[in-house]
């Protein structure tokens, strides 16, 4: 009897090996890449790899296998590219808009919002949200950028002694959180003055937990995470409930306000208790929108508001923090920025800025663009192929995860001379143009960042506000890039501040 069982087990094992070989053969002949092991694929390559090593790992593979290569993670085929031709083919397509499996990590928080949805649902939501970034609404948002940046300056005054390194990342994080809450939900959460508020703490808790799950691949599988990390799973669920409850309460309150208002009054015509015209927020647009004649449900709206809260504070925090770091390390750039700010905004540091003012800060825009090149907030972009795809004559089967190494591409010497140097003049109008998909810090194509104009205005407003009040000093250690959900620094982003006379 035991002999029969042994034979059956041996046959089963041999069948699995044969299936494994045949399954992988469909991908191994496509592109160059490391030789996979049975069952495990190339999983062992990632053993011990921490977030600070990921980009060097991608560069090493690129040197060895070329700009387009494949790896196997268990039985999942993954293709990597750092070639703008491949990236253009994928990102410009209306068919390949499904995010790859890694993004599923965010489902617990964001649900099926604009970042996560695909197909007809994504098209419908994108069409609804696009008007939120119309010129007239952005103009109203600039006032919020300016006011919340002023709070940031006030909070930093006591720390600006000209000799103490400040980790600017958490400071900018709270500022960005205040800005996105007021612009997306139309409500002030005062995160900068009350960083221990339950909602603010919940955002920080979930972000930190998701970062850990991103780093440890096995924790990305939800049931494994809950089985092996039950305390963290409960903490994550509790924090998500706090955020969802908060957003849902805001939605209910705003919906009731709209219902109770006169039918003749539009949100643009509403005024507050001071007699000032009420600003439109993303939430107002969503509450008044319909898809196929039906209004969005509260859950639909919550997904979109939560998506904006995530994308509007984490990526912006990364972008602004690294930009301030670069300015602090390049005094000639800082001096030129100061002159431009005086020329455009004047000498009165308390005077509010306008949308037109921010548009005239041309050199600052170059500085921000160059910082985004060196420190892209989203270092990788992923897609999942629902059908067979041919890229440069290479057949790639359906079910493949396709990852675009934006961080590596933006430092490629073929497209950027002296790529590790900070040179804002790269973006001067008279500089010869490079491949349009070689510089895509906001992604590109139909799924590009819908809020990139919003983000650029927010960055200009925040950076200019700091420079009007402080000199940025090169204090503290150099940041160590850490590839998480967004680009961070493992040791913070440090600089010094000295009040301007």
UniProtKB/Swiss-Prot annotation:
Name of this chain's protein: Cytochrome P450 4d2
- Cellular component per GO? endoplasmic reticulum membrane
Q: What is the effect of changing residue 163 to M?
A: In strain: CAM-44, CAM-48 and Berkeley
* Cofactor(s) demanded: heme
Origin: domain of life: Eukaryota
Task: Name the positions where heme binds.
Answer: 311, 449
Coarsely, its chief localization is endoplasmic reticulum
Q: Which Pfam families match?
A: p450
Keywords on record: Endoplasmic reticulum, Heme, Iron, Membrane, Metal-binding, Microsome, Monooxygenase, Oxidoreductase
Q: How does it sit in the membrane?
A: Peripheral membrane protein
Q: Does the keyword Nucleotidyltransferase apply?
A: no
Instruction: Show the Gene3D superfamilies listed in the entry.
Output: Cytochrome P450
**Molecular function via GO:** heme binding; iron ion binding; monooxygenase activity; oxidoreductase activity, acting on paired donors, with incorporation or reduction of molecular oxygen
Question: In the record, what lineage is assigned to the organism producing the protein?
Answer: Eukaryota, Metazoa, Ecdysozoa, Arthropoda, Hexapoda
Q: Which organism is this entry from?
A: Drosophila melanogaster
So what EC number does this one have?
A: 1.14.-.-
Localization terms from the record: Endoplasmic reticulum membrane; Microsome membrane
Keyword field contains Iron: yes
Under CDD domains, the record lists: CYP4
Protein's job: Involved in the metabolism of insect hormones and in the breakdown of synthetic insecticides.
């Amino acid at each position: 009897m035991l002999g029969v069982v042994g034979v059956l087990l041996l046959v089963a094992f041999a069948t699995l090996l044969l299936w494994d070989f045949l399954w992988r053969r469909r991908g191994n002949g496509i592109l160059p890449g490391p030789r996979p092991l049975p069952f495990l694929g190339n999983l062992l390559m990632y053993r011990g790899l921490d977030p600070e090593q990921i980009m060097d790992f991608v560069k090493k593979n690129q040197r060895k296998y070329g700009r387009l290569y494949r790896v196997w993670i268990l039985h999942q085929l993954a293709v990597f590219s750092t070639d703008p031709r491949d990236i253009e083919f994928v990102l410009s397509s209306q068919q390949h808009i499904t995010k790859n499996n890694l993004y599923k990590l965010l489902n617990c928080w964001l649900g099926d919002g604009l970042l996560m949805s695909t197909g007809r649902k994504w098209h419908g939501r994108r069409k609804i949200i696009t008007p939120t970034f119309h010129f007239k609404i952005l103009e109203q948002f600039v006032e919020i950028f300016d006011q919340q940046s002023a709070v940031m300056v006030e909070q930093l005054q006591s720390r600006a002694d000209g000799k103490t390194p400040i980790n600017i990342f958490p400071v900018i994080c709270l500022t960005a959180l205040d800005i996105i809450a007021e612009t997306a939900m139309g409500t002030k959460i005062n995160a900068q003055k009350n960083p221990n508020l339950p909602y603010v703490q919940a955002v920080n808790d979930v972000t930190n937990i998701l970062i850990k799950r991103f780093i440890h691949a096995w924790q990305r599988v939800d049931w494994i995470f809950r089985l092996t990390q039950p305390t963290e799973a409960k903490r994550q669920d509790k924090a998500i409930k706090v955020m969802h409850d908060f957003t849902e309460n805001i939605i209910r309150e705003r919906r009731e306000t709209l219902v109770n208002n006169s039918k003749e009054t539009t949100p643009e015509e509403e005024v507050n208790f001071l007699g000032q015209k009420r600003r439109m927020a993303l939430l107002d647009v969503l509450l008044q929108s319909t898809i196929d004649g039906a209004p969005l449900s509260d859950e639909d709206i919550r997904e979109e508001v939560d998506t904006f809260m995530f994308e509007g504070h984490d990526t912006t925090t990364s972008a602004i923090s690294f930009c301030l770091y670069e300015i602090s390390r390049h005094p000639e750039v800082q001096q030129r920025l100061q002159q431009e700010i005086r020329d455009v905004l004047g000498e009165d540091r308390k005077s509010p800025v306008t949308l037109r003012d921010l548009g005239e800060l041309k050199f600052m825009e170059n500085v921000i663009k160059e910082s985004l090149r060196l420190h892209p907030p989203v270092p990788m972009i992923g897609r999942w192929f629902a059908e067979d795809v041919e890229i440069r004559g290479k057949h790639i089967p359906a079910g493949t995860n396709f990852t675009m190494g934006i961080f590596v591409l933006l430092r490629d010497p073929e497209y950027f001379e002296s790529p590790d140097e900070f040179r804002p003049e790269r973006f001067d109008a008279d500089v010869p143009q490079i491949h349009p998909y070689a510089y895509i810090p906001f992604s590109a194509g139909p799924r590009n960042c819908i809020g990139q104009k919003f983000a650029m205005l927010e960055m200009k407003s925040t950076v200019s506000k700091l420079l009007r009040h402080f000199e940025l000093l090169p204090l503290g250690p150099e940041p160590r890039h850490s590839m998480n959900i967004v680009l961070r620094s493992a040791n913070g982003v440090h600089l010094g501040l000295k009040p301007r006379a």
